[in-house]
Design a protein with these regions (language model features):
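Membrane-embedded segments
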Residues: 56-152, 156-160
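Active-site-proximal beta-strand elements of phosphoester/diester hydrolases
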Residues: 54-64, 175-185, 220-223, 277-283
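C-terminal segment of N-terminal export signals and the immediately downstream linker at the start
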Residues: 22-58, 77-80
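N-terminal secretory signal peptides and thylakoid transit peptides that target proteins
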Residues: 1-21
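Active-site neighborhood of phospho(di)ester-bond hydrolases with catalytic His/Asp-centered motifs
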Residues: 60-61, 90-95, 125-131, 162-164, ...
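Beta-strand-turn-beta hairpins that frame and shape the catalytic cleft
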Residues: 46-57, 166-178, 272-277
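Binuclear metal-dependent hydrolase catalytic cores centered on His/Asp/Glu-rich metal-binding motifs
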Residues: 137-159, 171-219, 229, 292
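Conserved beta-sheet core of the metallophosphoesterase superfamily
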Residues: 220, 225-303, 308-310
Length: 324
């Protein structure tokens, strides 16, 4: 008997592989980025977060508004799902505007911000800004400063924006700090910069933000890009970030392309280094290309302190629920 496969077997293998590739491509372009939505839960145990201060935080990252992948109806679904989780606090981690050119209808912040204002939590909803929010504002790029369009729209919708700012909140009489960092990649290289290595410039001020936390109450830091994490001191119990989209393509815990100088180190999920905790959301939308594979759009829920009941009993029936 020949050791070589028959022609029929060879053709079946080739055609089957081709069908798998076509199907995977259709899923990555048409299904996962536009229709899937999961709840991703984390239960970190930061050393400097008191166990008797239970906190249920919902984090929304990288909406990247724009049809057909992120229409306003999809945002309404995300808002309704988040509200149904009944979080104590909601945080928006930046990148609200479209991140690629594959849009059939552009949707501005003036339309998106009122939808986000429908988010409900006892301790409120707080936002930071992302690099795409800055890059989309040509006036801000020309002037090398804000406030940018996204910040003004959120402000007009009564959604507070923290840009190198700290706010002191309290739950059940126990205080904590919420710190919002300015974007680390906000300013594109000037057009007249013709030679040399072109560098993006940030508007972040970590030291100035930390200095506003004037007592020893525990602190949570919102930072759009996770690359700041090595500089975050133990003073901060938890850092929440977005930006990476988990690489948009993620297989077996590995992302081939991650928009971070650290590669897969901070690509996605819960990271603990030197007893410091970071959670990186995979976000909701897409940038560069409208592709997601292995990292579905997600709403992140962070369960701090004494943990709540299982998330399956709290999430609505539609979106997928997962725990981590």
């Amino acid at each position: 008997m020949s050791r070589w496969p028959s022609r029929r077997h060879f053709l079946k293998t080739v055609l089957g592989s081709a069908a798998l590739l076509v199907g995977s491509g259709a899923y990555a372009f048409g299904i996962e980025p536009a229709f899937r939505l999961r709840i991703q839960r984390y239960t970190p145990k930061p050393r400097n977060w008191p166990n008797d201060l239970p906190m249920w935080i919902a984090a929304i990252a990288a909406i990247h508004i724009g049809e057909p992948y992120m229409p306003l109806s999809r945002v309404d679904e995300i808002v309704a799902t988040t509200n149904a989780l009944a979080p104590d606090l909601i945080v928006l981690l930046g990148d609200y505007v479209a991140g690629h050119r594959f849009t059939t209808r552009a949707i501005g912040m003036a339309e998106l911000a009122p939808r986000l204002a429908e988010l409900r939590a006892p301790l409120g909803t707080y936002a930071i800004l992302g690099n795409h929010d800055w890059w989309d504002d040509r006036t801000a790029q020309r002037n090398r400063r804000g406030p940018i369009i996204a910040a003004r729209a959120l402000h007009d919708a009564d959604v507070p924006v923290l840009e190198n700012e700290a706010v002191r909140l309290a739950k059940d009489g126990q205080p904590f700090w919420l710190l919002g960092l300015g974007d680390q990649l906000a300013l594109l290289p000037p057009k007249d910069q013709q030679s040399g290595r072109k560098r993006l410039q940030g508007v972040d001020d970590l030291a100035g933000t930390l200095a506003q936390a004037t007592d020893d109450a525990p602190a949570i830091l919102l930072a759009h890009e996770p690359d700041i994490f090595p500089k975050v001191p133990n003073r901060v119990a938890l850092t929440l970030s977005g930006h990476t989209h988990g690489g948009q393509v993620r297989l077996f815990g590995y992302s081939p392309l991650v928009p971070s100088r650290y590669g897969n180190r901070y690509a996605y999920g819960h990271v603990v280094e030197d007893e410091r905790h970071l959670i990186v959301s995979g976000g909701l939308g897409t940038s560069i290309l409208p592709v997601r594979f292995g990292v579905p759009p997600e709403i992140v829920v962070v369960d701090l302190g004494a943990h709540r009941a299982d998330i399956a009993s709290l999430a609505p029936a539609g979106p997928e629920g997962t725990a981590a």
